Each structure stands twice: as structure tokens, then as C-alpha cells.
């Protein structure tokens, strides 16, 4: 008899990789993935527990599955991931509809949990989140033509506003040979763009090899046949070195797009948030990167309303954005996370934090529009991702666009999904480029 399950993956790209690993393990064990949880034997909700909005989304999804279960339209409910890990002592007692819970160190136990639930047993598992990273194959759910490549787990930065080190554990690099083997397999299955991810990729190798190894890893990834783009997320200001900058500048397969989350520019705020480096360090690095890497696109993330941010500190941040002309910016209002030092600090109210975040995005919209207009009349490489019926055009991404968070390129042409092609840009509107294949 067929055993079916539905997967709901929430949160970041790193969590999606865990979902893809569970998809592989479940399919190997004879379970069949179905698109709709209604009527399925099991639903797996892989949760995020990072900020309040993410926790609310996770709880809403769990409760929705619980309602299906109560109505007899779903067999069992398994909850995994960061929310499960963060509230491991209480989640099953507070939400008794849940049949099984797995923490972030126990994704490999998904089949055992599923089998238990299928036989009417409740179970939970919380592994050691300081253990080496599990090397589990995955079913890639992204694309066409691209995939995430996670190179490490956990984080050692302990920023005052962030709970990730407490949830995901200390920083653990994956073995380089395992990463290369996975990348080769992805390339063999048509992946042309590798999006290299970890909480801090610039720290890669320091725990395993006693030195920073991201530049070496990028060199080896670029030697793999079929890989055309290597995109880097997330790099930290204090971990850049000359070898890495040289590799990014000189390796044609590394796209000239760097995601460097800075959160703020004011020295006082950086210090009390336990961010390494100063505002001047950020300015100097960005200047150096732009001088050494022509055409570089920088993405960063910012937090508005952090503890210590008054009008003067906020104005300093806005002035920095006007000067730095950062092409891609994500901004979030400060969300006090329980258990973190910042949650105990005095900060602006939620409404004011949101107002400041909105002002930053208004400012950034002008900068982004100027940047996008600069593509008009130019020919750029685009990774084709599909056909939009409503627009009557193909669409994809340029080197300046990371999936889900940046813009897209719509164009007329005849290439296939997952192919790289050249597109002449004719128009730019609200962060979207329009053109034609040549």
C-alpha cells in the first residue's frame, strides 16, 4: 500500500537544503511525495524559528495541518527544524496535535519518525548540534539550472540580536571533498549555477583545516565542467582576505555579486550588537571591492530600530546608503528575540522601527532604479527559468539577481528552461529588466 507525505518547507535556503535531504530519505524508504497535504498519510512541516514573523508563519502552518488531521483529512503531523529545536522542551505539550518532532541535529531520523507515526506512536529526537554536518543526499527542488550548495552549518558570530548560534550550534565546515562531489553531481544533472550558502561562508575551513578556505573551494568548484556561475551568500566584513578578493576578481565563474550583511554602519550600534569591525571597516572594504572587481553588485541586509539607534544613528545609516549606492538591500525592523542579549536592551517601538525600515526602502528604491536603468542598451547573460503565460515572455535572472530576493529579466526568445543565453536589455521598470534574446 502506498505511503504518502506532503512537505512544507519554511524559512531560509539552508533550511530548504534540510527539506531536500528529508525528501531524499523519505523517497528512498518508499514514501511518495504528494503536492497537497489533504488526503496524505503524513505532513512534514520544516520550520523557521528565527524572528517573530517566521515563528508566526510556522505556527500557522502547524495549526493548519492540525485542523486537517482533526477533520480526518491528514494522517499524521511531523514538525522539524528551527522552531522545533528552539522550543523542544514544550512544543509537543503545547501543541498535542503534533505526532513527532525532530530538531536541527536529527533530520536524518525522519524515516524512523515517519514509520513511528504511521504505526500510531509519538516520538521526538534532538541530536547534537555541535556534531559534524550530516552528509545526506538530497532531492533538489529548485531550478531549473541552479541549486543551493551548503558548505557549513551553525555560526560562531553570536551577534547580540540573533538566536541562530543557540539554535543551529557552533560553526562546522563540511569536508571539501564532499562538497566537490556534491557539486559534480549537481552539474551532471544540469545545474549551471551554484549558490554557495552558510551562515558565514567567509569562515569556511577555519575549524576543519585551520585556515580560511573559501578561495580554494571556489577555485575547485570553478573547475567542474558544466558549472558557469558561482554565487556567494553570505560573507562577513571581518573575514575577507586578499586571497579571496583576488579569486573573486579573477575567476570568471564567480559572479560579480556579493551578499555581505552589515546590519548597520554606526560604530556604537555595531559594538553593542557584537558585530565585528567598525563602520570605517565596512566603508574601506566596499571601496576596495569596487576598485578590484569592476561591475560588482553588492547585496546587504540591514536592521532598522536596533537598540541604541536614535535619529542621529538612523540618519548616519541613510547617509551611508546614499554614498555607497548599494545595489541590493533587504531591511527588517528590529525584532527582539527571546534569549538574546538585544532582547533585554531598550529599543524603539515596533511602529517606529517599521517607519524607519520603510524610509530605507524608499531611499533604496531610487538607488535600485538607477542601477537597473544602467542595463538598458547592454547585452547580458541570463539563466532562463521558465515562460510567463501572462507576460507572454521567457524569464530568468542575470548575474545581478539571486533567486527570490532580487529582480528578474523578462525577454522574448526561444531558449530552454535552465539554459544560459544572451539578452539585450531594452527597458527597466521597478527592478525588472525587459529585453530580447540575441
Task: Give short role names for the model-derived ranges.
Residues 336, 344-438:
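Terminal RNA-binding accessory module
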Residues 1-204, 243, 258, 281-291, ...:
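Proteins enriched for Cys/Gly/acidic motifs involved in redox and nucleic-acid/cofactor modification
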Residues 95-96, 117-120, 212-214, 248-250, ...:
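Short, hinge-like loop/turn segments at secondary-structure boundaries
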Residues 93-108, 215-227, 250-255, 316-328, ...:
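Structural recognition of alpha->loop->beta junctions
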Residues 8, 197-199, 233-235, 261-263, ...:
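Generic beta-strand/beta-sheet core signal
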Residues 159, 179, 196, 232, ...:
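Conserved, mostly hydrophobic/aromatic
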Residues 77-81, 86, 188-312, 322:
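Conserved SAM/AdoMet-binding glycine-rich loop
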Amino acid at each position: 500500500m502506498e505511503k504518502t507525505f506532503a512537505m512544507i518547507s519554511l524559512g531560509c535556503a539552508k533550511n530548504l537544503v534540510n527539506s531536500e535531504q528529508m525528501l531524499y530519505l523519505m523517497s528512498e524508504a518508499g514514501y511518495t511525495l504528494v503536492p497537497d497535504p489533504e488526503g496524505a498519510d503524513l505532513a512534514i512541516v520544516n520550520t523557521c524559528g528565527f524572528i517573530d514573523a517566521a515563528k508566526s508563519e510556522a505556527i500557522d502552518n502547524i495549526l493548519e495541518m492540525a485542523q486537517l488531521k482533526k477533520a480526518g483529512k491528514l494522517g499524521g503531523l511531523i514538525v522539524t527544524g528551527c522552531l522545533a529545536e528552539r522550543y523542544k522542551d514544550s512544543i509537543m505539550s503545547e501543541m498535542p496535535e503534533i505526532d513527532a518532532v525532530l530538531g536541527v541535529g536529527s533530520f536524518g531520523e525522519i524515516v524512523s519518525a515517519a514509520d513511528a507515526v504511521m504505526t500510531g506512536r509519538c516520538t521526538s529526537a534532538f541530536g547534537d548540534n555541535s556534531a559534524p554536518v550530516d552528509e545526506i543526499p538530497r532531492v533538489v527542488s529548485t531550478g531549473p539550472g541552479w541549486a543551493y550548495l551548503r558548505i557549513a552549518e551553525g555560526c560562531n558570530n553570536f551577534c547580540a540580536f540573533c538566536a541562530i548560534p543557540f539554535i543551529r550550534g557552533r560553526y562546522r565546515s563540511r569536508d571539501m571533498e564532499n562538497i566537490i562531489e556534491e557539486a559534480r553531481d549537481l552539474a551532471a544533472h544540469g545545474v549551471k549555477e551554484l549558490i554557495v550558502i552558510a551562515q558565514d561562508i567567509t569562515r569556511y575551513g577555519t575549524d576543519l583545516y585551520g585556515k580560511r578556505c573559501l578561495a580554494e573551494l571556489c577555485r575547485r568548484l570553478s573547475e567542474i565542467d558544466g558549472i558557469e556561475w558561482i554565487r556567494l551568500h553570505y560573507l562577513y566584513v571581518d573575514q575577507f582576505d586578499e586571497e579571496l578578493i583576488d579569486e573573486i576578481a579573477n575567476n570568471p565563474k564567480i559572479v560579480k555579486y556579493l551578499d555581505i550583511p552589515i546590519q548597520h554602519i554606526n560604530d556604537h550600534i555595531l559594538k553593542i550588537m557584537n558585530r565585528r569591525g567598525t563602520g570605517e571597516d565596512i566603508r574601506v572594504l566596499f571601496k576596495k571591492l569596487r576598485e578590484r572587481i569592476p561591475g560588482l553588485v553588492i547585496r546587504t541586509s540591514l536592521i532598522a530600530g536596533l537598540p541604541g539607534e536614535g535619529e542621529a544613528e538612523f540618519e548616519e545609516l541613510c547617509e551611508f546608503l546614499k554614498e555607497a549606492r548599494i545595489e541590493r538591500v533587504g531591511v527588517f525592523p528590529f525584532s527582539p528575540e527571546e534569549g538574546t542579549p538585544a532582547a533585554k536592551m531598550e529599543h524603539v517601538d515596533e511602529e517606529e522601527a517599521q517607519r524607519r525600515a520603510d524610509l530605507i526602502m524608499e531611499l533604496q528604491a531610487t538607488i535600485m532604479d538607477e542601477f537597473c536603468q544602467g542595463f538598458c542598451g547592454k547585452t547580458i547573460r541570463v539563466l532562463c527559468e521558465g515562460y510567463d503565460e501572462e507576460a507572454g515572455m521567457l524569464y530568468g535572472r542575470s548575474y545581478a539577481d539571486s533567486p527570490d530576493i532580487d529582480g528578474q529579466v523578462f525577454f522574448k526568445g526561444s531558449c530552454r528552461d535552465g539554459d544560459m543565453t544572451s539578452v539585450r536589455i531594452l527597458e527597466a521598470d521597478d527592478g525588472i529588466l525587459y529585453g530580447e534574446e540575441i
